[in-house]
């Protein structure tokens, strides 16, 4: 499934949880804010078919960093590299792992990922002390829900946020 964004007014007038006490505020709620950052980061991925982004906030909801899936920095792949998903997949660095390289254990409290973290990435996020993880697209092969439950990490799907409709992250082919 792809993420959807229906209209600008939908988040303003929605019953989505907010991080402030002003219910009449038009301020973007934290889940949608951090997911929008993750989505924007995903647009930097060089993978022409699958773009994944991640963003981290500290305990005060300040941005720690953003990251995306991609190849080792400086590596220039030939066009034929992208032809086979199976072949290229083993070389791709996941957005969550790239993100974890930007902060120390316990520094990030909230992480948003455009796709539910795979099992290994979920383990890494838990090991880094992340307490809340937002994601848009589910990933059926991941054990993330079980890992989150075991470690007391909130794993919450967020599909209604700016950018999701206008800039798709999964392209056909």
Language-model features: locations:
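Zinc-dependent deaminase catalytic domain
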Residues: 3-173
């Amino acid at each position: 499934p792809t993420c959807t964004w229906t209209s600008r007014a939908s988040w303003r007038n929605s019953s989505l949880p907010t991080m402030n006490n002003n219910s009449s505020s038009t301020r973007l709620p934290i889940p949608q804010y951090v997911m929008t950052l993750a989505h924007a980061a995903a647009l930097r991925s060089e993978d022409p078919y699958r773009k994944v982004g991640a963003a981290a906030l500290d305990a005060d909801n300040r941005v720690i960093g953003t990251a995306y899936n991609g190849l080792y920095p400086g590596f220039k792949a030939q066009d034929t590299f992208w032809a086979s998903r199976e072949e290229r997949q083993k070389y791709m660095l996941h957005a969550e792992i790239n993100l974890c390289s930007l902060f120390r254990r316990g520094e990030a409290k909230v992480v948003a990922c455009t796709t539910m973290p795979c099992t290994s990435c979920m383990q890494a996020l838990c090991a880094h002390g992340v307490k809340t993880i937002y994601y848009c697209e589910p990933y059926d092969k991941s054990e993330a829900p079980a890992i989150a439950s075991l470690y007391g990490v909130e794993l919450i799907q967020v599909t209604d946020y700016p950018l999701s409709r206008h800039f798709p992250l999964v392209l056909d082919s």
